[in-house]
């Protein structure tokens, strides 16, 4: 009988051991800022075999992934990818937005100090993001035994993906010419970061963010984090979030078809191939799960489009603000429009209250005036967008992109390919932020651990990325998640 009991206990232990949850050793989230989905194929024949083509040829591609909110900008994209949520819930309503009648930056936090430099570039944290991230949920699932690290040149592209419970987030201080962090995470830089900065710094104020070299610097820092933090070497799954910022900055300056854009994507492909080889060696080819996506897309340059007889143009939002304020000055005796951002107009509550006016009257008068402008397809009260006659898919994106107290009171939808800016025959750049496919259609690739080669054209959304990764890890999805697991 004792032998039988011993045998049964042994079998139970063996079954229990074999039934342990299987997870990769490392999860890598890679965001390429302003990467339109079609860049996967526009440059395909020029890519090498070890970078983007390797992801396409060995991984799984969700070919029809769209952003399901507007405005489509960097901070919102990064927060939505990792929270599986939208601005209406996360509170990240733009890169910049107005709060209490003041313009604020999404990650600015005067309560923390810069670590690694004497500038204010490190006074940043995720405190304005109201939802958890993949990394936060991974930490909770492992009782905070996992390591989560964020790396990017842009602060918001490192801070928001890494989340609230990250072990570290590092970004580039242009004035110092090296990577920094904030006291939100730590009181001093780890020795490996100090050593990296000594070997990989630039001259102070050199704008590496707008060069292909910035891509290389980001991947070098990410590789250093893998090696020195020993990511993927512990008992629990670790996470590394990486964002490539120069693709966005170069795109803004030179648009989607310039030689500069070509150069940065060739550099991206080369550096990605080396990064994947490093992961193969350091973590193991089948031990890491990587996903690649983008924070948003971009419109083609309007001069380029016009050369081919395709309607396009620029909306001079500064002129609209001035014109609207002039109109409201004549009607009410005040000029309450503080400015435009994210295709929204922001009103100054203090100015309206001091004049003894009802805010709704000012909003209604503003909308009536703006509707006369043929540049706009729709002008609406953000609080009442559900009552506006417009296609449901646009309405849904407007609703998802609105956060009371941080978004503007008045929203506008311009004609397709008409983005915010000034008209100039010399203008070579581009913008993003609209609800149309050129801004919303982004890549979403899975690669590595437990991923079979394939593709899908089923409509998928940016908010589906986080629940997909969490489902693969068998952990809870982020607490504000509205997406669906797709793999």
Predicted regions and their residues:
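A long, amphipathic alpha-helix that forms part
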Residues: 39, 209-234, 247-288, 469
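Short, solvent-exposed turn/loop segments enriched in Gly/Ser/Thr/Pro and often Arg
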Residues: 62-82, 150-158, 243, 289, ...
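Non-catalytic, well-ordered alpha-helical segments in soluble enzyme domains
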Residues: 53, 131-140, 342-379, 450, ...
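Bacterial Sec-dependent N-terminal signal peptides
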Residues: 1-23
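His/Asp/Glu-rich, glycine-adjacent segments
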Residues: 86, 94-236, 245-252, 371-374, ...
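Active-site-proximal N-terminal segment of extracellular/periplasmic enzymes that hydrolyze or transfer
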Residues: 20-60
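Secreted, luminal/periplasmic, and some membrane-associated catalytic domains
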Residues: 47, 64, 73, 96-123, ...
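Substrate-binding rim/cap in mid-to-C-terminal beta-strand-loop elements of soluble/periplasmic
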Residues: 319-357, 431-473, 487
């Amino acid at each position: 009988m004792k032998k039988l009991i011993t045998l049964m206990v042994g079998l139970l232990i063996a079954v229990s051991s074999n039934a342990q949850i299987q997870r990769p050793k490392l999860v890598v989230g890679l965001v390429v800022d302003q990467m339109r989905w079609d860049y996967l194929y526009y440059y395909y024949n020029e890519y090498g075999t070890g970078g983007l083509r390797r992801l396409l040829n060995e991984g799984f591609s969700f070919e029809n992934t769209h952003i399901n909110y507007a405005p489509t900008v960097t901070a919102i994209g990064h927060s939505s990818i990792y929270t599986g949520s939208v601005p209406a819930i996360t509170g990240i309503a733009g890169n910049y937005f107005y709060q209490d009648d003041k313009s604020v930056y999404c990650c600015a936090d005067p309560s923390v100090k810069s670590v690694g430099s004497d500038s204010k570039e490190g006074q940043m944290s995720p405190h304005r993001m109201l939802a958890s991230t993949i990394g936060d949920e991974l930490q909770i699932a492992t009782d905070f035994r996992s390591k989560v690290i964020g790396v990017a040149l842009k602060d918001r592209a490192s801070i928001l993906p890494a989340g609230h419970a990250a072990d570290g987030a590092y970004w580039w201080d242009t004035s110092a010419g090296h990577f920094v962090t904030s006291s939100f995470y730590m009181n001093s830089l780890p020795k490996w970061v100090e050593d990296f900065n000594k070997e990989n710094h630039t001259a102070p104020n050199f704008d590496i963010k707008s060069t292909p070299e910035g891509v290389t610097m980001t991947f070098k820092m990410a590789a250093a984090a893998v090696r020195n933090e020993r990511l993927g070497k512990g008992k629990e799954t670790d996470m590394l979030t990486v964002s490539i910022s120069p693709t966005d900055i170069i795109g803004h300056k030179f648009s989607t078809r310039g030689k500069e854009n070509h150069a940065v994507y060739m550099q991206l492909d080369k550096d990605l191939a080396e990064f994947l080889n490093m992961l193969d060696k350091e973590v193991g080819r089948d031990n890491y799960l990587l996903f690649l996506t983008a924070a948003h897309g971009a419109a083609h340059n309007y001069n380029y489009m016009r050369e081919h007889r395709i309607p396009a143009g620029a909306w001079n939002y500064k002129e609209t603000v001035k014109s609207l304020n002039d109109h409201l000055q004549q009607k009410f005796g005040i000029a309450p429009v503080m400015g435009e951002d994210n295709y929204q107009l922001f009103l100054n509550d203090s100015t309206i209250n001091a004049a003894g006016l009802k805010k709704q009257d000012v909003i209604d008068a503003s909308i009536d005036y703006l509707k006369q402008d043929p540049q706009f397809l729709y002008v609406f009260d953000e609080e009442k967008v559900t009552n506006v006659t417009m296609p449901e898919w646009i309405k849904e994106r407007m609703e998802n992109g609105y956060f009371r107290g941080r978004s503007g009171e008045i929203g506008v939808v311009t004609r397709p390919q008409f983005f915010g800016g000034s008209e100039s025959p010399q203008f070579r750049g581009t913008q993003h932020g609209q609800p149309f496919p050129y801004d919303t259609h982004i890549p979403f690739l899975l690669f590595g651990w437990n991923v079979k080669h394939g593709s899908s054209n089923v409509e998928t959304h940016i908010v589906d990325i986080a629940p997909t990764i969490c489902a693969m890890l068998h952990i809870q999805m982020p607490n504000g998640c509205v997406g669906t697991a797709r793999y």
